[in-house]
Swiss-Prot record:
Catalytic activity: a quinone + NADH + 5 H(+)(in) = a quinol + NAD(+) + 4 H(+)(out)
Highest taxon in the source lineage: Bacteria
Subcellular location: Cell inner membrane
Family: In the N-terminal section; belongs to the complex I 30 kDa subunit family.
GO molecular function, one term: NADH:ubiquinone reductase (non-electrogenic) activity
The EC number(s) this enzyme carries: 7.1.1.-
Enzyme superclass (EC): translocase
Protein name (Swiss-Prot/TrEMBL): NADH-quinone oxidoreductase subunit C/D
Length: 599
């Protein structure tokens, strides 16, 4: 029977993923802290997951950061409400947990540290002295779960208004607006909200002036053409010079992670498109790969190549908008209109294949929505013949312009050490000389079968970042040409019980297959209780999904790590001492959208 088959498949280990319990770092940890110091959790994340005691946390992280091949980046930090989780066999008792995901460039390996917390002692020491980018992550973890980080420089709300009450990612917090009392905005409440947004320099350790003169405090945004979305930066100015600044985010926050707890594994796919709304199918990739790890699904080669093709089309589309708007921020208007002509050709191709343009929601658990249509190859070939010359025109007409180069070269530069400290990935990291591209270093969806280069820079400035994007478009065109020439034959879905939706023809076999199809489409597939993780090279850096299944049709915890979030946190450290005009160029060079930051 189909139900028995699902049970058998669920018992198998996930494909192409290992717990890495034999990772050399485990031996190093045991040798230093003792064989019984930790609880090791088997997962389908593909990385060691180690539970450490609260009092050992900073010592363990310091040890990992000082190893001969160190774990130099705090890739992610967040929490989980463990109180309603039923499948916790072998794990330390916990009401809540906080995880620290560390990354080593030299090892090309990760490790995840977890700390169990009781509701009565919901506190941890801050990790900001070790990893400065822990600042925002700890603020968000306190905001969403109520975990207090002792010693944090400014533990306050980050995604939600200052007046918000409660911790939304707790399991006892309502997930729908209809579960709250009707919202009413009185004049008194409106005044209170506006007062709460008033910037008070003293709360951020800023002085209002010197003995001789006052500083100016200026709001850039949240509605400003150069802030690239609903994003506010409070500038502390001495004339035109930026003494300090405070990025203020959250205006675009939609509760994407909370939504993951009430959507089925299948019905959450459209939400992934909207995390970074320019990325389209790129955003779907880490989510469906993480779910497929939970399910133990290996997709056909044709599916892998189709996914790569759609991802690279969206990468080009996003990069073209970035390149043209960067030029616009510096003062050149014409390339924006050129770019929209070129992007229209990409959208026409995407629409012909998927039926939609910006948000196709086209990848599926175990495959894609449908096979490639007749004529897709002709459309792709026409685009590949068109784009290279157009790309050259951007470089010749604008990016080699002496005025643009004068505004961008040497501006907002940082080195590789600083990039790693702040969790910078993507072109922002590669511009400092580190060729870390997940498609090359940790291939997924068959990227190991494609021939392409990873461009790098040397100066880590605005000009390096934009020129890297130009070269990345060229490399994406190379990948697309290989997709065109070497598209495998075969099915567009995996033959697996948890492929969703299941192949329609199965419903015609007997009543069990019809029941299974009905349940998977209406309620969603039941994923084995476990944890999985997948990172990918998205358009703006590394995007990842960390999924926790409790053996049901919905995710127990969906953690979305986006690249733009740490990139904006880095702004003050880079731009202090520069001019306001340099900040505009720097913002244009980061490549971010606020949906990616705020989720």
């Amino acid at each position: 029977m189909m139900i028995d088959q699902i049970a058998q498949e669920s018992a198998r280990p996930a494909w192409q993923t290992h717990d890495h319990l034999d990772d050399p770092v485990m031996g190093e940890l045991r040798n230093h802290f003792g064989p019984d110091a930790f609880t090791v959790q088997p997962t389908r994340t593909g990385i060691p997951v180690v539970w450490v005691k609260r009092e050992q946390l900073l010592e363990v992280m310091t040890f990992l950061k000082k190893l001969p091949k160190p774990y130099v980046m705090l890739f992610d930090l967040h929490g989980m409400d463990e109180r309603q989780r039923t499948h916790r066999q072998g794990l330390p008792a916990a009401d809540f947990s906080v995880f620290y995901h560390l990354l080593s460039i030299e090892r090309n390996r990760d490790i995840m540290l977890k700390v169990a917390l009781s509701e009565k002692e919901l506190n941890l020491p801050t990790a900001t002295p070790l990893f400065p980018n822990a600042n925002w992550y700890e603020r968000e973890t306190w905001e969403m779960f109520g975990v207090v980080f002792n010693g944090h420089p400014n533990l306050r709300r980050i995604m939600l208004p200052p007046t918000w009450e409660g911790h939304p990612l707790r399991k006892d917090y309502p997930a729908r607006a209809t579960e709250f009392d009707p919202f009413e905005l009185t004049r008194q409440k409106e005044d209170l909200e506006m007062e709460a947004l008033t910037f008070k320099p003293e709360e951020w350790g800023m002085k209002r002036g010197t003995e001789n003169e006052d500083f100016m405090f200026l709001n850039l945004g949240p509605n400003h053409p150069s802030s690239h979305g609903a994003f506010r930066i409070i500038l502390q100015l001495d004339g035109e010079e930026i003494v300090d600044c405070v990025p203020d985010i959250g205006y675009h926050h939609r509760g994407a992670e909370k939504m993951g707890e009430r959507q089925s594994w299948h019905s959450y796919i459209p939400y992934t498109d909207r995390i970074e709304y320019l990325g389209g199918c790129v955003n779907e990739m880490p989510y469906v790969l993480a779910v497929e790890k939970l399910a133990g699904i290996e997709v056909p080669d044709r599916v892998k190549t189709i996914r790569v093709m759609l991802s690279e089309l969206f990468r080009i589309n996003s990069h073209l908008l970035y390149i043209s708007t960067f030029i616009q921020d510096v003062g050149g208007m014409t390339p924006v209109f050129f770019a929209f002509t070129d992007r229209q050709k990409v959208y026409d191709l995407v629409e012909a294949i998927t039926g939609f343009r910006m948000h196709p929601a086209w990848f599926r658990i175990g495959g894609v929505a449908h096979d490639l249509p007749r004529g897709w190859d002709r459309l792709l070939r026409d685009f590949l013949n068109w784009m290279p010359k157009r790309l050259d025109s951007y470089v010749k007409a604008a990016l080699k312009n002496s005025i643009l180069k004068g505004r961008a070269i040497g501006v907002a530069a940082y080195n590789s050490k600083q990039a790693l400290e702040w969790g910078t990935t993507g072109a922002g990291l590669r511009a400092t000389g580190i060729a870390f591209d997940v498609r090359k270093w940790r291939p997924y969806s068959g990227y190991e079968n494609f021939d392409f280069d990873v461009p790098i820079g040397n100066n880590g400035d605005c000009y390096d970042r934009v020129m890297l994007k130009v070269e990345e478009v060229r490399q994406s065109l190379r990948i697309l040409k290989q997709c065109l020439d070497n598209m495998p034959e075969g099915p567009f879905k995996a033959d697996h019980p948890l492929t969703t939706p299941p192949p329609k023809e199965r419903t015609l076999q007997h009543i069990e297959t019809m029941i299974n199809h009905f349940l998977q489409v209406s309620w969603g597939p039941v994923m084995p209780a476990n944890e999985s993780f997948q990172m990918i090279e998205a358009t703006k850096g590394i995007n990842s999904y960390y999924l926790t299944s409790d053996g049901s049709t919905v995710s127990y915890r969906t953690r979305v790590r986006t690249p733009s979030y740490p990139h904006l946190q880095q702004i003050p450290s880079v731009i202090r001492g520069s001019l306001v005009s340099d900040l505009i160029v720097y913002l244009g060079s980061i490549d971010f959208v606020m949906s990616d930051v705020d989720r």
